[in-house]
């Protein structure tokens, strides 16, 4: 399953003619295309593990900076756990390279997290990094394939460090040049060294973004 989504997306892309890959709106929230200097976008996503609201601003042609607020009902995407929690994160995206047919970027979203379970509060720090590839399939459709490592650590006598390794893909459909609807999927194991075990983690989120 972990290999299925990226494999299907790659197969579809290889079947497209070269001219179909030379288009796009020139920006993205989920993929690697940055917003552009001076542009700002608001975004919202909902699904599993929760609700996320974000704002992102283009400080240069290759760098976006912003922030995110998340209210989760699934603990960091663990499919077996439904503890409510909140996260406050910074948001950095750096475009590494870009051509007419593909772009590459790194993201970093650090910030504190709090989960509430049976009257206790687990406090931790999220330090997620991700590598994403963006492919403009048409003027209205952007595909992304990514490897995410949303590392986080809980303080005190709690869970300790958690090392998720998630893969997957996503789609952004541009309703017009400023408005996009999206779906993003990542899944994989979340390794918990202190427990000597792992949990299956998944992010499946529908979203919308507006750039101005």
What positions do the PLM features span?
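Outer-membrane beta-barrel transmembrane domain signature
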Residues: 26-33, 96, 100-103, 107-212
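Short beta-strand-initiation
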Residues: 8-9, 39, 50, 166, ...
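Short hydrophobic/aromatic segments of transmembrane alpha-helices and their interfaces
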Residues: 4-5, 46-47, 162, 208
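Short glycine/proline- and aromatic-enriched beta-strand/turn motifs that initiate or cap beta-hairpins
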Residues: 19-74, 209
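Mid-chain, structured segments of secreted extracytoplasmic proteins
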Residues: 68-110
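Membrane-embedded beta-strand positions in outer-membrane beta-barrel channels/transporters
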Residues: 41, 52, 64, 87-91, ...
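Short, solvent-exposed coil/turn segments
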Residues: 35-37, 48, 85, 164, ...
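Cleavable N-terminal export/targeting peptides
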Residues: 1-28
């Amino acid at each position: 399953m972990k290999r299925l989504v990226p494999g299907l997306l790659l197969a579809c892309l290889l079947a497209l003619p070269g001219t179909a890959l030379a288009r796009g709106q020139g920006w993205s929230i989920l993929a690697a295309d940055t917003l552009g200097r001076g542009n700002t976008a608001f975004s919202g996503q909902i699904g599993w593990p929760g609700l996320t609201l974000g704002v992102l601003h283009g400080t240069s042609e290759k760098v976006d900076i912003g922030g995110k607020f998340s209210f989760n009902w699934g603990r960091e995407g663990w499919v077996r756990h439904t503890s409510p929690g909140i996260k406050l994160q910074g948001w950095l995206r750096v475009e590494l390279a870009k051509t007419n047919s593909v772009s590459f970027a790194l993201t970093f979203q650090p910030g504190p997290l709090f989960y509430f379970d049976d009257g206790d509060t687990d406090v931790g720090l999220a330090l997620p990094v991700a590598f994403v590839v963006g492919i403009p399939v048409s003027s209205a459709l952007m595909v992304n394939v990514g490897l995410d490592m949303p590392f986080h650590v809980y303080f005190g006598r709690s869970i300790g460090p958690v090392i998720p390794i998630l893969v997957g893909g996503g789609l952004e459909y541009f309703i017009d040049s400023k408005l996009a609807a999206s779906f993003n999927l990542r899944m994989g194991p979340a390794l918990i060294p202190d427990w000597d075990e792992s949990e299956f983690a998944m992010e499946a989120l529908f979203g919308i973004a507006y750039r101005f």
